Amino acid sequence: MHNDVIKVSSETIIKPKGIVNVVYFSSPSNNTHRFIQKLNFLNSRIPWNLDEELEMNEDYVLITPTYSGGGNLKEGAVPKQVIKFLNKKQNRNFCRGVIASGNTNFGDTFAIAGPIISKKLNVPLLYQFELLGTQSDIEKIREILINFWRK
């Protein structure tokens, strides 16, 4: 388990309102994009171009890949586009949870972007999956998100 993983108190978790909504980042390889399309939920993509912006005004769960070198190298784990998006207070305020992908070859830093964001925003880390994800990951994440949105 990452030492960056924190336990978010159930009293501090803000349950999302509205319909299931995902905000995600995907590089030009579109790996995360293809995964998101299989979830079949309302979604918005954080732009690759740092000059473009996305502003959220409704609750969402963030799904992001991890960029990291493994070992103790955590610097650069959260894509700079995601950092820019979350630097906007309004975008942070509507984030209700995070899901991250990564590569298990990187050991302790596998999907570390999730724990980093979870800790920074004090939102739950809902799930982590490897690389492109599997059909099982898609089914688990769908179930997690549907249950998370339930009243």
Per-region residue spans from a language model:
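Conserved beta-strand scaffold positions in the cores of enzyme catalytic domains, especially
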Residues: 22, 43-45, 98, 125-126
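Short, charged N-terminal beta->alpha structural module
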Residues: 13-41
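Short, flexible loop segments at the rims of nucleotide/cofactor-binding pockets, characterized by
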Residues: 39-44, 73-77
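Short His-Asn-centered micro-motif
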Residues: 24-26, 46, 63, 101
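A short, well-structured beta->alpha microelement
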Residues: 41-55
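FMN-binding flavodoxin-like domain, especially the glycine-rich phosphate-binding loop
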Residues: 2-14, 58-151
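Short, catalytically relevant binding-site loops at active-site mouths
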Residues: 29-31, 50-51, 67-69
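Short, surface-exposed beta-edge/turn micro-motifs
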Residues: 20-21, 57-59
